[in-house]
From Swiss-Prot:
Residues 57-315 are annotated as: Disordered. One of its GO terms (cellular component) is nucleus. The keyword Transcription regulation applies. Disruption phenotype: RNAi-mediated knockdown significantly reduces protein levels of ATP-dependent chaperones cdc-48.1 and cdc-48.2 in embryos. It comes from Caenorhabditis elegans. GO terms for biological process: positive regulation of gene expression; regulation of DNA-templated transcription. This is High mobility group protein hmg-12. PANTHER family: HIGH MOBILITY GROUP PROTEIN HMG-12, HIGH MOBILITY GROUP PROTEINS HMG-A AND C. It is found in: Nucleus. Residues 147-160, 196-205 have a biased composition (Low complexity). Signal peptide: none annotated. Residues 118-128 bind DNA. Keywords: DNA-binding, Nucleus, Transcription, Transcription regulation.
Amino acid sequence: MSDVAEEKAEFLVIRTYGSESFRKECADLIEKELHKLNATIARVPVGEFVAYAENAVKNETDSEAVGSSSVKRENSANDSPANTNDVDIVSSPVKRGRGRKAKNPSADADVNDTGSSPVKKGRGRPIKNPSADAGSPLVKKGRGRRAQTPAADTDAIDTASSPVKKGRGRPAKNPSADAGSPLVKKGRGRQAKNLAADTDAIDTASSPVKKGRGRPLKKTAAEADVNGLGSPSANRITGCPPSTKVSNQSSPPEPAVNESEEADEPVLKRGRSVKQPKDESESDDEDAEKAPAAIPKKRGRPGKSAIDAFFDGSD
């Protein structure tokens, strides 16, 4: 041991932090390294050593071999613990096996509360949690993405009563709250067509409505009968004259028929045409040509024969 070494005799104070099992492992490792340097070791509570050695700290590589960046090199003559402004790493988590101190942004930034925010395993970096500032409870699990709240900008949408998609704070479109129409498709914001607002003829309250849409059905035959005469086929059977009022019937009104033309046409009876009887004047002329002139035919009325007329002297 040289004189220079005697003058610069140094001692190390090594402290380890963490769980009890981790500190014991560090203690065994440090003890092995100090034995290689022929250092005198004195163990204080678990995980703390005071090592006196002549050549324990000759250069910085020896301090790195110890395995902790929290090693403090103190000179008994010059240095003092009061001059060291090191960060207290007792409360901050440290990676296992390395002496690298975990980043602790909570000391600089007052916005993030690391006490209540979840921390990733093995690092002291807190997860971003802007929901604490925005006041929105809808935050994705494990991510710091803030939920979109358009209800703050638009007063028409009530996000408290409107359905919300799973996992996002985006409210579903609900124009029915503005339009006041109860006929809205399930799960979509499409507003039902409400024709009753434009046309007064259609009563959507009493008319049947298709399922899922606000489009009313077409009028039935009972609603289309304005005159109260029933169907057009019934008018023909009963013989009622066609009405002069404009109705929704598809058949046009029947034209007027002349009586002279009606006599010549055959009469329809159960789908068959029946010949009309001939006039009496026409039948008498035809019989006169066939029968002899002396004896005319009697057609049910009293008359004289030709012989009686000859004796009487009448023509």
